[in-house]
Amino acid sequence: MAAFRAAHRLLGHILRNESSAGLVTQRWSSSAAVASVPKSSDPKPHAQPDKRKPKTGILMLNMGGPETLDDVHGFLLRLFLDKDLMTLPAQSKLAPFIAKRRTPKIQEQYSKIGGGSPIKKWTEQQGEGMVKLLDELSPATAPHKYYIGFRYVRPLTEAAIEEMERDGVERAIAFTQYPQYSCSTTGSSLNAIYRYYNAKGTQPKMKWSVIDRWPTHPLLIQCFADHIQKELNMFPADKRGEVVILFSAHSLPMSVVNRGDPYPQEVGATVQKVMERLGFSNPYRLVWQSKVGPMAWLGPQTDESIKGLCQRGKKNILLVPIAFTSDHIETLYELDIEYAQVLAKECGVENIRRSESLNGNPLFSKALADLVLSHMKSSEICSKQLSLRCPMCVNPVCGEAKSFFTKQQQQ
């Protein structure tokens, strides 16, 4: 999953009919090992234990990923039923059919990366580091408590909201874990919050505000740059300067881009800031992965770019997942296995590596804490960008959700 942004990042895998043969199961790069996934299916939203009543609740929004192979079908079913992500004819009937048909294929892919997605594990670790820092930096708004709200797997966004209400949270911050905004990822998560209250016909007990995008936050940029430099240093010294950096993000259909989705521009802004931080040390390109179907999508595609570079004698390549902060199937399977192992061998790549995702980097938790702290100090409900609908938006719920959040009043 449009990653139609991150949700379509995964959609690329879900709809793909071709499989790669001869895959090896271990992580190819020494810099980012695949973590084992706990085999749990707790139906309750996850929040860290804390005896104190939380004053500020931070809802960490993401699409999520199946922790176990048994979770895959439910994940796919919720994904295909999400009308913010895609609209299908007779969606309530077609979605279960597609989910059932695709489950074995996607289970096979997850089995090659350890049996499930590590995204919940990383989100927990990031959240714990974030609230610990916030309690130290902002005692006036403490205790702080993080909650995880996934769109397609437990803990679901709606269940997390219920947990926050029961905890008596006074101030709720909807904090997207997508640095770059897209209507079908961050937008879908925010729509889910609005739909929750709209279905109940009640106003929130909590006062909501939103961190809806952060593509150029200085600490985010530093994290990316540090991870890239670390991986560049692993290339042979005589090849290091000619390594081509391919920043890879999930592609979007041009029909979505042409409606005015800001995702491509925001991803580009992240890339520009990262390369500035690196002093433009290497040639680079922004490329797009997970294209689905015959329609026009943002390009060039990551796999085609690898092929094209090799044909032109550029055979030292560093892949950088620039729109993904935590490892999941698109980094661990698509980038690490399909591209860095299978495709690279076919193309005759000399050296190919993948920059480690931000995962458990303490500096990244510091970035998250800084974003929340700055947001609370600003007293802003959301960014000015969030109040603006895409010029050619076709989803009326987007307008209703934006109105819901912009009308929230902070105490």
From Swiss-Prot:
[2Fe-2S] cluster binds at C183, C390, C393, C398. The keyword Membrane applies. Residues 1-41 form a transit peptide. Its cofactor is [2Fe-2S] cluster. The keyword Metal-binding applies. It catalyses: heme b + 2 H(+) = protoporphyrin IX + Fe(2+). Signal peptide: none annotated. Pathway: Porphyrin-containing compound metabolism; protoheme biosynthesis; protoheme from protoporphyrin-IX: step 1/1. Protoporphyrin IX binds at R102, Y110, S117. Binds 1 [2Fe-2S] cluster. GO terms for biological process: heme biosynthetic process. Residues 41-51 have a biased composition (Basic and acidic residues). It is a peripheral membrane protein. Its main location: mitochondrion. One of its GO terms (molecular function) is 2 iron, 2 sulfur cluster binding. The active site is at H217, D370. Keywords: 2Fe-2S, Heme biosynthesis, Iron, Iron-sulfur, Lyase, Membrane, Metal-binding, Mitochondrion, Mitochondrion inner membrane, Porphyrin biosynthesis, Transit peptide. It is found in: Mitochondrion inner membrane. Residues 34-55 are annotated as: Disordered. Its EC number is 4.98.1.1. GO terms for cellular component: mitochondrial inner membrane; mitochondrion. It holds the Pfam family Ferrochelatase. Homodimer. Homotetramer. Catalyzes the ferrous insertion into protoporphyrin IX. Belongs to the ferrochelatase family. This is Ferrochelatase, mitochondrial. It comes from Xenopus laevis. The lineage of its organism: Eukaryota, Metazoa, Chordata, Craniata, Vertebrata.
